[in-house]
């Protein structure tokens, strides 16, 4: 991509392509000449775009944006998700980048439109490493969303059973109640649609009601 295209082309298309490619040189030119690193593109900040779309130089791109003033706690306007929400929702979260965001001041208990905090998004991966890192920075594992769901009230349809069991064991060791009920009086086991996960919840004294 030519410098002229970065600066004067279709802004949304050009910067998104630069971020997708992880082209640090082009991104530096963009940041130097365009100005507002926190301008929104399709309701997403550049930091949100990088977390969701960057294919190369992942850590470097995100660090560069932060070093140039990207708002670590900015919201997507429609879901109110912060960058930390988005990276925790990755199937394979980048732990080094999660640590970077937390070190630079990301709010570990920021709430999205449903009052879910980033730790809720561990349900996309059930990473014990991610859970422990969030807890280290003060994540409240007992937090509930606006429907009183806990982070275990989920359908588990795509859940890895081995990862899930390790995740549950850590939660229990931290004092988490796997039989918490939401506003409809349902426990995680009641909502579970995955037989293997049901067996794990029952193994750790999960109750239907």
Regions found by a protein language model. Give the residues of each.
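Intrinsically disordered, low-complexity regulatory segments in ankyrin-centric signaling systems
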Residues: 1-33, 38-55, 59, 63, ...
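Ankyrin-repeat-protein effector appendages
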Residues: 1-14, 137, 167, 174, ...
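Ankyrin-repeat boundary/"N-cap" motif
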Residues: 8-15, 39-52, 75-88, 111-117, ...
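Ankyrin repeat A-helix N-terminal signature
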Residues: 17-22, 49-58, 86-94, 121-127, ...
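Ankyrin repeat domain, specifically the short helix-to-loop turn at the C-terminus of the second helix
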Residues: 28-36, 63-71, 99-107, 132-140, ...
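Alpha-solenoid repeat scaffolds
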Residues: 37, 53, 57, 72, ...
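Eukaryotic tandem repeat interaction scaffolds
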Residues: 111-147
